[in-house]
Amino acid sequence: KKRGAFLVMSNIVIGIEGYVGAGKSAICRELLNHIPNSIILEGGNLYRAIVYSLLKSGMDLSNLKQNMSHVDIKSIMEKLKITIAIENRQTAIYIDGQKIDEEKLQSAQSSLAVSEIGTIANNDKLYEFGRKLIDQFKEKYNVIVSGRALMEIYPNLDYHFMITASLDERIRRKSIQYNNKIDLEELRQNIQRRDELQEKAGYYKIYDKTIVVDVSECENVQASAKKVLSFIKKENIDNEFCE
């Protein structure tokens, strides 16, 4: 965009999807350090908050899952009084005015339930909500979006990344995330089950603009983020990182 004699950069939207345990959330947080005026929208945490609330209320999820194709996720979100805010450039989730910490949202129980419900729910209104949210924040920020089905939610993504890693590496990373408290075989089954559900729902779909980034050999999140940043135009990145 031109304003007078100056060239004004338009804010960009970067979509980060990935296989379970490939480290997309950590990569998003690292990208904040290298993409000026950026924020993270964690789409997955909205779903996790919904499932967390339902689990906490003692609702029978098996009964809910049988009728999920008729359920409007956005209306559930409103009934549970789930709201989203940006704090310290990251997504904060509130349920009935109370902030929910990341550890509760990322629990193994919630994650599997999210995968099961997300594959069969009617997401149209939630996608519409996400689209408006991205447009709203893009007016002021470069937006890094983490989640599933991002090309359906926001087809005009400037970049769409699919983060992959080997199954063994993903198990290793998830084990660290859960402080080695979960049996490795249980973790393997959990990840494989979630992979099956995601693939069945078409969440690992590769589009023409999708850039697949394998981070199996990356020693740390900084190396993973650097691999992602290598595909982003230099004018959108902190100059120091490009040297």
Regions found by a protein language model. Give the residues of each.
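Conserved lysine of the Walker
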Residues: 24
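N-terminal phosphate/diphosphate-binding loop that engages ATP/GTP or pyrophosphate donors
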Residues: 34-106
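Walker A (P-loop) ATP-phosphate-binding motif of ABC ATPase nucleotide-binding domains
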Residues: 13
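ATP-dependent NMP and nucleoside kinases share a basic, alpha-helical "lid"
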Residues: 95, 100-179
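Hydrophobic positions on the alpha1 helix immediately C-terminal to the Walker A/P-loop
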Residues: 27
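Hydrophobic anchor at the beta1->P-loop junction of P-loop NTPases
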Residues: 16
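The conserved Walker
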Residues: 20
